[in-house]
């Protein structure tokens, strides 16, 4: 499992919680993913639409993180539990 750090995914995932991840290099819109963006690791909800890709926190106090074309972005896995 992977340990969550921080409160950006509350209330579904809390600081210090361990989540289980299925290795994957792609994911569907709405999946909770483990990914890297410009060498920074994230656990976020994946949003894919006509505007591109964004990483969404479940905690509303955090703004979405847009993934730009020039960014180095890689999905490592999908959170399954």
Regions found by a protein language model. Give the residues of each.
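Acidic/glycine-rich C-terminal interaction modules and beta/coil loop segments
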Residues: 1-81
